[in-house]
Amino acid sequence: MYLKHIHLYGFRNYHEQTLDLQSQKTILLGNNAQGKSNLLEAVELLATLKSHRTNRDRDLILEGKKTGQILAMVERTYGESELGITFRSPGRRSLMLNHENLRRHLDFLGHINAVEFSCLDLDLVRGSPETRRSWLDTLLIQLEPVYASIIHQYYKILRQRNALLKVIRKTVEEQENSSNLSAELSQLKVWDQQLAEAGTRVTRRRYRVIERITPLAQKWHQEISSGTEILAINYLPNIKIENEDPQQVQQAFLDKIEQRRMAEQQLATTVVGPHRDDVEFNINHTPAKSYGSQGQQRTLVLAIKLAELQLIEEVIGEPPLLLLDDVLAELDPNRQNQLLEVIQGRFQTLITTTYLHSFDAQWLNSSQIMKVEGGKIAQL
């Protein structure tokens, strides 16, 4: 997999910029707030249709513009593909593949794969459960593009069920006609079933991906820590499951919904389902979030990112792109060397940095070095 070029128009702080990628390794050099991370964000959007920095398309469009666009050419073993995303404010984004407009996200996803590693990824360990759920979902979308539709459908059902729970609470509080309440409770049973079915599809996939990535991350973690630390990754689903059998998982959903029915009606929100899942990271049997040093947390995240690269390559049959956003400065020399040694010429890599002294001469000589300043990119 090779990203040959990328063109940005009205995206973030770029008026119009084309970058031809002529090396397996591209170093983007520049001060902060010049546009280095914006370029990596564009690649992330091409891979996942998501940004880890914002949920609003308006934020992706250059100030004063009504549209922004990312165009790219990617080369795979089966041939070349031209990808395009157009953002509108107001309006919905549109997707393009080989000059044809696409109606479904599913048809766009999977043409380019990327793993991003930035200093923000420490939030994976010390941040909220929402951060860890988002990490799982982003990984799953790249491994199985149909997952984007599965998770979208789940949250759509969740919103509709929550709306009905609010109506039910209002009916109870205002002591309205009991026949209205009876009809609403019957309707809730229908949403219970839909939530359990959609939630089962999400839970089973999250369960499986944790099972697959854990041994890979443990292997990398052993290597980076020189065998002094033991990593454990535990999926903490909101419902108790023994295995990923779909019937058992779905029944566990329905049982817990029944147990929490009164609480949900009082709170007027759904408290059962994968939107309440979490992932736990332990180092030497101790929660990394609470007790891990910053060095241990960085080692953990680096191991996970290397495991992501390995897992995606195993599943899709080609190495994904690696996006390193000002991360070398956050790593000590040992971890820097581990990371750079793994990359070598195996993964096409885009690296942002404010200085070059983290790289040895051999790395610099084999890299394309670009200067980024004020939304403009030029060969150094």
Swiss-Prot record:
Biological processes, Gene Ontology terms: DNA replication; DNA synthesis involved in DNA repair; double-strand break repair; SOS response
Record SUPFAM superfamilies: P-loop containing nucleoside triphosphate hydrolases
NCBIfam families per UniProt: recf
Cellular component terms per the entry's GO annotation: cytoplasm
Name of protein: DNA replication and repair protein RecF
InterPro entries in alphabetical order: AAA_GajA/Old/RecF-like, DNA-binding_RecF, DNA-binding_RecF_CS, P-loop_NTPase, RecF_2
Gene3D superfamilies: P-loop containing nucleotide triphosphate hydrolases, RecF/RecN/SMC, N-terminal domain
Pfam families: AAA_15
Keywords for the protein's UniProt record, in alphabetical order: ATP-binding, Cytoplasm, DNA damage, DNA repair, DNA replication, DNA-binding, Nucleotide-binding, SOS response
Organism for this UniProt entry: Crocosphaera subtropica (strain ATCC 51142 / BH68) (Cyanothece sp. (strain ATCC 51142))
Ligand binding (ATP): 30-37
Highest taxon, organism lineage: Bacteria
Listed GO MF terms: ATP binding; single-stranded DNA binding
Cellular localisation: Cytoplasm
